[in-house]
Amino acid sequence: MNAHATPIHDPTALHAWVVALAHELGFALVGVTAPAESSRAAALRAWLDAGKHGEMTWMAETVEERCDPRRLLPSVASIICVADRYHDGSRDCEQIAQEPSEARGRIARYARSKDYHNLVRDRIHKLRHAMQKRFPDASFRLTGDIQPLMERDVHQAAFNGQIGKNTLMLVPGEGSWFVLGELHTSLVITPSTRPPAWNRDDPCGSCTRCIDACSTGAITPFSVDASKCIAYLTIEQRGTIGPEFFGAMNGWIFGCDDCQTVCPHCQPKKRRAVDERMGSVAARYEERLNSVPLLELLGWSEEDRARLIMSSALKRATLAMMKRNAVVLLAEHAAKHAATCEAIEARLRSLQLDSTEDEVVREQCAIAIAWLASQRA
């Protein structure tokens, strides 16, 4: 990595140096902003008060830190925001499974490669190391989506993107297929400026495709009820999935991309590709696993889980959660394909009666069996 030899003290020159370093490290987007309380702090508190965070109690416990990044690093003067493109927007080939053994659960695209947390964090560490070497007295702190920070707000302030109606950060004309990371520093760096191509504050206009595509009704303009979101239900919720969501999971076993795949900005043929870095997907995000066989998953051991998914973001879901999700999807499959219903229901009954199985999985089987009976009534 070329760290450039000239010492830098001017905030504007430092901005150019940091952006060059980050691009050398392969980041598609780089922006800088000054720390400030989030403009959506009141909206976040109202969202929490309404219980739309579901079981994610840690969000309420860290609300003050989330709303003001200065609480994460008191000496912070600048936040460097970086992002990677992890998908080009192309659609998956639809495969219609008729037999239970063919039924598979889809994985959200960000979780199909190696764990993006590591892919982003490792290079932010390199960025920090280069900056610390040049400025040994400066303070730094890395953040990502596991720290209490409204990071999409911060990236919007750094002009990396704009927040869409589905609450994801999207780049106008390029979409929302980006994973984010940040480096907070005590160094004063000139903030980024608004790109000339951004000719509106609202990137969505009258479009409601993401809202219309959400099968659980989780999305309203610029807000998502996490307790109804498929991504939350399959990844964050620890208990059973209620029968009100059966028939709406759309084959997703981990996460959901439905609100992105319909977004006009996310379509590969419509992307502007103004910047090659922004438009291309690095080899580090090569897909390794895009779906899993549902019946086979019900027989997984902890060793199977570790072997197949522990190097990816899939590890966020426990084995019991993955099995729970598979139970729901198998019930949906049985409801659509009557010829498979008897075999799937027999497997679910067997799992429900297995005293060695996790209680949540057994309870989910009972819910699924009752739901299938209601579909026949």
Q: How should these model regions be labeled?
A:
Residues 1-202, 241:
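Auxiliary alpha/beta "docking" domains used to position bulky ligands
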Residues 27, 209-231, 238, 252-278, ...:
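Iron-sulfur cluster-binding cysteine motifs and their immediate structural context
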Residues 163-164, 172-173, 178, 207-208, ...:
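Short gly/pro-enriched beta-turn/loop segments at secondary-structure junctions
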